[in-house]
Amino acid sequence: MISTVSLFWALCVVCIVNMARYFSSLRALLVVLRGCDPLLYQYVDGGGFFTTHGQPNKQMRLVWYIYAQRYRDHHDEEFIRRCERVRRQFLLTSALCGLVVVSLIALMIWH
């Protein structure tokens, strides 16, 4: 029989792998954005996005841009596809992180 603790750790590993995929897709999106729309790239702090001196308020602009699906009116098809992929991965990763938290609470109650 599979233990609940091992299932919890497997869920954590899946969540971490999906986070890595999300950040990789976000980095690829920023590369495409730099080429197709330099003004938007500067607007969302594309150059400093993954650095310690990045500006979180500018980074949140990209998050809200993707969340509100404002990219649908963009002229570049590859950029639209990348935004869709990042949005789906963000929703999946958020759901998995929520499931990890719920699982952790359940493990604390039952053990």
Curated annotation (Swiss-Prot):
The gene is uspB. The keyword Transmembrane applies. This is Universal stress protein B. Its main location: membrane. The chain crosses the membrane at residues 1-21, 90-110. GO terms for cellular component: plasma membrane. It is a multi-pass membrane protein. Keywords: Cell inner membrane, Cell membrane, Membrane, Transmembrane, Transmembrane helix. It holds the Pfam family UspB. It is found in: Cell inner membrane. It comes from the Bacteria.
